[in-house]
Amino acid sequence: MLTYPNINPIAFSLGPLKVHWYGLMYLIGFVSAWLLGYWRIKHYKLNWNNDQLSDLIFYSALGVILGGRVGYMLFYDFQEFIHHPWVLFKIWEGGMSFHGGLLGVVIAAWLFCRKYGKTFLEVGDFVAPLVPLGLAAGRLGNFINGELWGRITDVPWGMIYPHVDDQPRHPSQLYEFGLEGVALFILIWCYASKPRQQGRVSALFLMGYAICRLIAESFRQPDSQLGFVAFGWLTMGQVLSIPMLLIGIWLWWAKR
């Protein structure tokens, strides 16, 4: 069995300012998205320019942070939000929802489309290959924070989280790093390397993420304040992923 390493969540301090690893992971995600977008524009000679790319990353960053935090409080910790609304601003403590962030990015993309006259699916197809590496960085942030641990297991790589209990658990943050991050990146990046019908890349991302999340959540300990939210075995993350999967299937079929 493995033991979770005692990692200081603070990467470094600049005077009174403490820079957390979790925040750095988000910065890495946004920077990697810009670099990948820049490479795709140049390599594939896409009808995008650097100003549009920078604006898109900026809009998306706001959508991810605001939507992710609000989504977490609404989907996962609503009672805490009602009684202590100021916790909404404690982003460095963790507590971000991918599905909330996705909704935030949808709104940001809509505003971006209005500004630049691009279609929503064109923007979605451009953004989709840029996202998984950011998801991978976010899951590493979860691991460093020692949060979102897995269910009790007897597999040889089970990890004991001393701050939780003395039972070996699935390192589910690393599973999600591998599935939602690395595997999904390879899938989407390779698929988007050739011209595709508009909407197909977006559809593949929606389906791919939903499937990865549905699998990974089966190893993850449900949030203590929620438990299983449907049928006695579905977690909130799985419930929120099902509409993604259905929309992805519908979009894939519609764009065949």
Swiss-Prot record:
**What does UniProt give as the signal peptide span?**
none
**What GO biological process terms are annotated to this protein in UniProt?**
lipoprotein biosynthetic process
| Compartments reported by the entry | Cell inner membrane
Main localization is: membrane
Record membrane topology:
Multi-pass membrane protein
User: Which sequence ranges are marked TM in the entry?
Assistant: 19-39, 56-76, 91-111, 231-251
Q: Which residues form a coiled coil?
A: none
GO molecular function annotations of the record: phosphatidylglycerol-prolipoprotein diacylglyceryl transferase activity
Which key words are in the record?
Cell inner membrane, Cell membrane, Membrane, Transferase, Transmembrane, Transmembrane helix
Q: Which GO terms describe its cellular component?
A: plasma membrane
Q: Which pathway does this polypeptide act in?
A: Protein modification; lipoprotein biosynthesis (diacylglyceryl transfer)
Family of this protein: Belongs to the Lgt family.
What the protein does comes down to: Catalyzes the transfer of the diacylglyceryl group from phosphatidylglycerol to the sulfhydryl group of the N-terminal cysteine of a prolipoprotein, the first step in the formation of mature lipoproteins.
Q: What is this protein called?
A: Phosphatidylglycerol--prolipoprotein diacylglyceryl transferase
